[in-house]
Amino acid sequence: MNVTLLIPARYGSSRFPGKPLAPINGKPMIQHVYERAALAKGLTAIYVATDDLRIKEAVEAFGGKVVMTDANAASGTDRIEDAITQLGLADDDLVINLQGDQPLIDPISIEQIITLFERHPGEFGMATLGYEITEEHELNDPKHVKMVFDNQFNALYFSRARIPFGRDTDDYPVYKHLGVYAYTREFVRTFNKLPLGRLEDLEKLEQLRALEHGHTIKVAISAFDSPEVDTPEDIRICEARLAVD
């Protein structure tokens, strides 16, 4: 099975312009993401998908591969579709979508999501990662997307609110969504033809589109958190963790 990992990266960000190139311990953030992903077993190729020449030059400077995408891509999945088309991937090829602001991604987590497709070929077209929340402040923070899943680890819902709600107790596990996706090339094509979902639009969570239209999202629970860098203040947290990693 061919497995291509794509790292979509945009230069523009309202909260943190130039985020992919922000230095973390002497390297641009996108380099940390790329190099940690490269440690995962089972990958055929890794590309950064971007529409910005500054990011392209930075990636090529450390020896990474880049595919230039349409600057007018409406969403992250549209950018992935553009990259897949340019790379000429086959319908049954596996595509991993790793966000460019996850410099702490653990390669074992990437291997987990590949294993899901190896063990259950043809049973689903999309999978993602979850992590049991250990920091209390994340429980009610809408920045941290929560998720629930059934006994077969099929996603039931994603929300910015705390789910599930414990009517009589607060002592129960709550899982957050880690922004890593895997799908077959064929499913990406299917997904991009689906109309915007009502819940997707309400929560501003693109993955809800798949659930709203009856598609299965398989979940793997990671033993490793992968916090995203959303603000310059998050850089200090990453630097401290990378220093001891």
UniProtKB/Swiss-Prot annotation:
NCBIfam families: kdsB, PRK05450.1-3, PRK05450.1-5, PRK13368.1. One of its GO terms (molecular function) is 3-deoxy-manno-octulosonate cytidylyltransferase activity. It is found in: Cytoplasm. CDD domains: CMP-KDO-Synthetase. PANTHER family: 3-DEOXY-MANNO-OCTULOSONATE CYTIDYLYLTRANSFERASE, 3-DEOXY-MANNO-OCTULOSONATE CYTIDYLYLTRANSFERASE, MITOCHONDRIAL. Activates KDO8N (a required 8-carbon sugar) for incorporation into bacterial lipopolysaccharide in the Shewanella genus. It comes from Shewanella loihica (strain ATCC BAA-1088 / PV-4). InterPro entries: Cytidylyl_trans (IPR003329), KdsB (IPR004528), Nucleotide-diphossugar_trans (IPR029044). Pathway: Bacterial outer membrane biogenesis; lipopolysaccharide biosynthesis. The keyword Lyase does not apply. HAMAP family: KdsB. This is 8-amino-3,8-dideoxy-manno-octulosonate cytidylyltransferase. Belongs to the KdsB family. The gene is kdsB. The lineage of its organism: Bacteria, Pseudomonadati, Pseudomonadota, Gammaproteobacteria, Alteromonadales. It catalyses: 8-amino-3,8-dideoxy-alpha-D-manno-octulosonate + CTP = CMP-8-amino-3,8-dideoxy-alpha-D-manno-oct-2-ulosonate + diphosphate. GO terms for cellular component: cytosol. SUPFAM superfamilies: Nucleotide-diphospho-sugar transferases.
